[in-house]
Amino acid sequence: MIMTYAPPPLNRPTYSTLTSSSGIRPAAPTPPAPQRRRKGWLAIPVALAVVVAGFGGGLIGSSMQQERPPVIIEQARPERVVTAQPVSATVAPDTAAVGAAVIPSIVTVEVGTEPNGTFTISGSGSGVVLDAAGNIATNNHVVEGGTAARVILSDGRIYEADLIGTDPLTDLAVLKVSADDLAPITLGSTDGLTIGTPAIAVGSPLGLEGGPSLSVGVVSALGREVQTGPETVLYGMLQTDAPITSGSSGGSLVDADGKLIGITTAVGVSSIGVEGIGFATPVEIVKRVTSEIIATGSASHALLGIGGDTAYDQITDGGSAPMGVDVRTVSAGSAAEAAGIQVGDVITAVDGTAVRAMDELITALRRVGGGDTVEISLRDGRVVTTTLATR
């Protein structure tokens, strides 16, 4: 997909990288950003600078941008006052029960070399058992750069692992071990998640011996766009304040029922104190990508064939609100052209899921694969069907 972004108008803080193998190192400073410009479309940075929390040295994140309207402050109007609704108390999750259910599904992934039959570890991360056949999900950045891998189960058993395949675009990978009595994790869904929903991270931080660790928090944001490297941007990420540290990459983020809602992938570490922010790849993307890797050794990705930007509508109080993706270009021979999508159209939904911004369109397309057929809703009321190309 062709994507266009405006340059960032705001300065961003400097972040530090952190991995289980490299400790703490200062990040390169984020370059100053140009001043805010008012020229019809306004832009602010979207993604935090983050670090991957596993093998291979921290990658310094930089800003990705998408267009946003100005923040407008006005005096309160009596007719628009909204009365806060009382919040009923809810039962806290039974974290002991969640731990008992999830920990057997979490493994430590050690990556290194084995030149003379002796395994030499160079870094470590976490993994999640997907099935009884021994397929294990982890992050691509955990396994890249190594020539050998082994897996340590929660009960201490150690197995050599084969790399089935990787997908750098989503930073996912699949390892496989031949072992009995595995405990596959139960997959959940992110569809019903709201900010404040309990979230529990289970992984192998710092490569510590003794089995996985559990930390508790909430889902603190949804649909984050996160850049973890020069060419790696992750979309639709879950944000959590459940502590995620070095070595936790590839571990699980689960809900109060112990069901997988994401694979922990990155953590924000800032020199100005912006900490306690972790990011997880949503389970829907994990399920699609790992299933394809298990079946074919690689994952496909959908290509619609448009270039565009977030479109904004003026609203009655003088502000503006995102309302879809304004199509700026349509590639010849693309799935978009075949569906009759034209420059000037505004995409508002994919398969019934609302799309208000460019990053939401990318997230929706990453949930499906190349060759899949989708329905695309347009602002003028049309709903078109097209088969997505593969890249």
Give short role names for the model-derived ranges:
Residues 112, 356-357:
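A diffuse structural propensity rather than consistent per-protein peaks
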Residues 242-243, 251-252, 307-349, 354-356:
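PDZ/PDZ-like domain segments forming the peptide/carboxylate-binding groove
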Residues 16-40:
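Intrinsically disordered, low-complexity cytosolic tails and juxtamembrane linkers
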Residues 162, 291-298, 337-342, 348-354, ...:
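PDZ-domain C-terminal substructure recognizer with occasional recognition of PDZ-binding tails
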Residues 2-15, 37-314, 332, 362, ...:
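Serine-dependent protease modules
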